[in-house]
Amino acid sequence: MGMVAILHGVKPKFLEECLTNDETVHTLEADFSGQNPDCLDLDKSWGGLTYLLGGNETGFSSDEPTSQAITNQQVINEEDILGYTPAFYLTCEQVAQIANALGELSHDTLKSRYHPNAMTDIYPCGWSDDDIEYLLGYFDELRQFYQTQSQKGHAIISYIF
């Protein structure tokens, strides 16, 4: 299976509960079927997507807001690992900001940022010229997920599983 990114759209009250009782985050269940509109499985695209969205050369977030769409510096409990990382979170206000920014990005912009030779350290490694289509497909899902969660007034909790 490898390392996959999972994002959950949650009500702000649920996020507050997670921040006061970090065991609450363990009640989230990943949906790998794609049937839950409040859960998104980004498969192994997370590192490449983060890079295209303005992340650094390791595939993790930078100060660029769109690069924080999958992982970021806000964690529920740094010592509580869900799979490979702690649970990251974005408030409903941050979700709305990122949803707007993702909505402004085009496939052409992302294609211009795609440099497989510069992505050698980005999981899952071994990027080729053809992999851009794989990433663009997941970008479209990510953008739609953010639009939906923003419209619902949801926060987002994410982790690498």
Task: Show where each model-derived region lies.
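Acidic (Asp/Glu-rich) sequence patches and key acidic residues
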Residues: 1-137, 141-144
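C-terminal or internal capping secondary-structure element at the end of a domain, subdomain, or sheet
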Residues: 134-161
